[in-house]
Amino acid sequence: MKDARGFLILWALIIFGAWIGLSVSKWQSGADEKGITTDTSAGEVVINFPEAPDEMPATWDVVFPEDAIPGEMVVHFTNRKDYQEYLRALIQAGLAPIGQIDELLVVRIGKDAMSGPSPGLFGGEGSFSYRVQRPLPPVAVAPEQYAQLRAFGESARSIVGGPVEGDGSGVLVGILDSGIETHPQFDDVYIVHIDLAGGGVAGPGAAHGTAVASIIAGSEGIAPAAELFVVRVLDDEGMGNSFHVAEGIVQAVDLGVDVLNMSLGVYQDTQLMREAIRYAEDHDVIMVAAAGNDGYTQMPYPAAYPQVLSVTAVDRVGRQALFPNQSSSIDFAAPGVGVLTAKENGGTMLFSGTSAAAPFVTGTLASILSSETECSHTEVVDLMRRTLDEAGAPGVDPVYGAGVVNWDRLRERETSTILDVALAEIYLPANALPGTTMPVEVIVQNRGTSWLTSSTLTVIVGKGEPVDFTIGTLGPGQTTTRKVYTQVPSIDSSDSLNIAARVVSEEPLDDVRLDNNTKAVFFRPIQK
């Protein structure tokens, strides 16, 4: 009897344990009683739809992630047959999708379609559409720090020093933004535009896109003869969604754009955005995006994708603008403080942010493409990389990325006799400990087109004696670093660390830019 009772108790425990395990499993996977499950193992929420008709709920009680667009989902299919059969099933049920991207086999559905045929019957897998926005204005920087930045106060064309290469003729540039307003700067520009955000291409809130477009192809822009394909994906408040961004990317690619500018972002990676970026990459489109103005140590998407050229902002003297996000995957640094651009009602305004910096790169690429017609898109990007000015820590760094765009070097690249040695940077790590001895790295760069055989670098720390270094052979674009060790002032000290340096070639009279041979900086610990 005891054995029978023990057996029954053991059996009951097994059944109870199995029930508990099933309940926990369903809760962890996000399952409801109707067979809809969610999976977050890939870093984003993926919806698994039921594959049997009787498992489909009449209504879906779905918990939408933060920043997801409520009341709608994105359904992905792996083949065109299933994709078309699902669309046909919706029509037969008297339903319709909110949107679809045929090239990506993606359907956007709302609440009404959620009560229709299960996408799982057709092999569909779901995800969410997320809020996308233009980079926020750089307001998080303390006013006293922001005041230290030096605004350009000039148009893009003046900043780059006139024509870079070609005028953009024959190049089609796509702009995904808040639309574009009529402005005298665009009187001679051929513009095709569509509105995916529903506010009208030139409706309220189009000022951001207008400023971006004027840097690229306005009469005061870098490539004034380029043609524009403007896709409005942001509303009058600068907000949009990742479905419209993906749709805009695909439409721009299908229209044949050469370069695509995206001064917008979202911090949620999605399958939909990845597929759209891959689609553009497969069609050899150069993509450029703003790194963002939030001061984070990560970048938003699409700038964070390796296929996209990400751009941070610098001020008039080449300093990082304090507000941009930081990442070692940043590709270029370009002007982004107080750039004079077009605005509504035919006027002009000072435009700041990585949203301003990105179109400098886009416009420059359009200019080069219109002149270097035999170069591939990859070769044109590599050409820009080879003429960047070193800044920040040696090599690629999270603040300046690979370097600052230098338009003079772009123009001079085919003149083989230019001598230009530059004092590129005096670098002390931001995490230098007050009161300790730390290395200061002094970076010299050959910004000319001829080889440097010998130069002399002189470094002065505080009131100390000058220290000389001999710089050997440097090829065009190459850099070299010398270190000096010094005491960093303590945290409670009012002293600052002053360092000055100068580099002189053995033929100083042949140096075309003596103004970049010297640099002086001071470091002061931040008082708590």
Per-range role (PLM):
Residues 162-168, 239-261, 270-287, 296-312, ...:
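Mature extracellular/periplasmic domains of secretome proteins
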Residues 182, 191, 203, 313-355:
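Catalytic-core environment of secreted peptidases
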Residues 30-50, 54, 62, 253, ...:
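C-terminal subdomain of the subtilisin-like protease fold in secreted/lumenal serine endopeptidases
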Residues 407-528:
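Extracellular/luminal regions of secreted and cell-surface proteins that mediate adhesion/ECM remodeling
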Residues 213-216, 233-234, 258, 322, ...:
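Hydrolase catalytic cores
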Residues 6-11, 21-22, 51-67, 93-102, ...:
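Protease zymogen maturation seam
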Residues 177, 292, 353:
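Active-site glycine-centered loops adjacent to acidic/histidine catalytic or metal-binding residues
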Residues 162-173, 179-192, 200-243, 305-307, ...:
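Subtilisin-like serine protease catalytic core
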